[in-house]
């Protein structure tokens, strides 16, 4: 059954430093809805200090949800709380953007999960290198990527690294590639966490959702990631062959540098890959629910 839906796109920017609230509202009409289901909305938050990200501000926090109308208030409240409770500091700029999803939402299975103990960053990084090799990345290409990690850490998003050319190929500079428009419904995540004896915390949920979407792209071999959160030292390697491999310690506490590299096989259309990562809506859901 189809019906005429009024799709709303609006953006709320709050610059706390100057106590300024700016609201930009647009509306458009779209015929029908996906499979007769309730409209779904992408809710995205970014927070920074001293200026917006594109003006050189320090990144503080980010997050997003895919949610129906009835869950919008809870989603926005949760993102506000996340933005103001990050260990990187208190933001003076925050933007929350909502937009309707008017295209099919792809469903992706969670990755198999494993955990590796490491009591020093050096041991953790050594584990990461071995896992990347198991995923199919040549050792000399792993080392070439590591040589540029300090530069890649400046990017707000991820870096696409071509393992044939041995170089970064996204062309996004400090912006990087932001994996977006994905979520893992809470009830499904909770059941998955219980089954796999994993903590039911939002950090694992969000990281695994990103990893699952990244690994779903046929041209991406593996992801290497650790957070820029100074209080969070765990990182991971994710790959189709290996699943989601968490590593206990990949940096020292207090270190605000992070890393996110997507290793590609050299055959991808870069713009198509970036479009999938940033624009394709995705739900993570266990196999029995697909």
From Swiss-Prot:
Q: Per its record, how is this protein called by name?
A: 6-carboxyhexanoate--CoA ligase
Known EC number: 6.2.1.14
- The residue range of the signal peptide is none
Tell me which HAMAP family the record gives: BioW (MF_00668)
Its gene name is bioW
Record-level GO BP terms: biotin biosynthetic process
Question: What is the main EC category here?
Answer: ligase
According to its UniProt entry, what is the function of this protein? Catalyzes the transformation of pimelate into pimeloyl-CoA with concomitant hydrolysis of ATP to AMP.
Catalytic reactions of this protein: heptanedioate + ATP + CoA = 6-carboxyhexanoyl-CoA + AMP + diphosphate
- Keywords on this record? ATP-binding, Biotin biosynthesis, Ligase, Magnesium, Nucleotide-binding
Tell me the classification of the organism that encodes this protein: Bacteria, Bacillati, Bacillota, Bacilli, Bacillales
Q: Which GO terms describe its molecular function?
A: 6-carboxyhexanoate-CoA ligase activity; ATP binding; magnesium ion binding
Give the quaternary structure.
Answer: Homodimer.
Q: Which cofactor does it need?
A: Mg(2+)
According to its UniProt record, which protein family does this protein belong to?
Answer: Belongs to the BioW family.
Q: Which organism is it from?
A: Bacillus amyloliquefaciens
